[in-house]
Each structure stands twice: as structure tokens, then as C-alpha cells.
Amino acid sequence: MAHAIRDPREPHLSLYADEEAAITGMGIKRRMEFAAGRSAGHAVLESLGCPATSIPMGRDRAPIWPSDVVGSVSHSQDVCVAVAALSCNVRAIGIDVENLTSLDDDLAADIASPRELACMNAPVGLAALRVFSMKEAAYKAQYPISRTPLDFDALEVTPLGLRFRFPVPGFHRGALLPVCQWTNADLCLSLCVL
């Protein structure tokens, strides 16, 4: 597995034509985040020994990795991160990075149950952000397998990981998705590797 980090506020090398086409019409901030994410993605492909290639955006907005690679890209306002692995070693990967700032308490009920928030052992707004990040990483890992869009209530935070509340293709009801999470003073990073 390989990872790379880029700053979305800094200029990055030019994109491939299909990557450039994907950001036509986007605002400058989103274009910079996309370019930084793809730059990080290109770096992880190089680290894995893959030939240089584009990472186009699919209709579902997910990155399209080479057929022998699984990967994920995420960004916050301060950092873009990409992680990837050869598909012979890892089934799927999901990553999420968020600035560690409290969400409005009103949003917490849309993201997590009171029991899930309690698992985070943090004030409600920070707990909601951390649950959001975990669910986002798990969503990104399961999506290439299930091809099923999920709402926040489809996955439940447990001490062992996130549990499916109902079956989706490739996962039975109760299937666990392992998620690791790290926080520091500025960022929350969640990673799900299947």
C-alpha cells in the first residue's frame, strides 16, 4: 500500500487531458483540490511501480484507477491525500480527511445515532465529524464492490468497525468494515482497507 499527500493551495503539475476535461466548469478552489488529489494519486501509482497514467473521474465522480489497482482520494481545505494498493493484495480502500472542526449539533442526528456519537467520547459536534469521516471512508471502500449508494444510516459505528444494517451486493447484513481513525489538533483521518 502507498500513500501521498499534497497541499491543494499549491500549484501542481498539469493534469492528463481526461482529468482536465473532468474539471471544466469547476471553480478555482475545486480545480486546485482536484489537481492536488490527482497529483497525489499519480505519486501513489508511481510508488506501486505502475506506469504513468491518468486517473479519470467516473460518472459517479469516483476516481477510476488502473484495473490492477484499488485506491481512494480525499481532501480537506488544507490537505489532499491519496492511498492505493495492488488489487491482488487489497480488495478495496477508502480514505477520508477532514479539518477537525465541530459540525453543528443540528447535523449530528442526520449523520449518527446517539449511541454512535457516544462511541466517540467527544462533544457532539466533534463526535459527529468523526463519525462522518469514518462512514465516508467505509463508503468509499464498499462502493467499488457493491456499486450501491448508501445513506448515513446504512452503516452503524461499533467498537469493532462499521456494521452494515442491511445487505448490499458483496456484503451481508451485519458485515463489518474495519476503520482506523487518527486525529491531531488540525485533522481527522479515517481509513478503511478491505
Tell me what each language-model feature is.
Residues 1-194:
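Core catalytic alpha/beta fold that binds nucleotide/phospho-ligands
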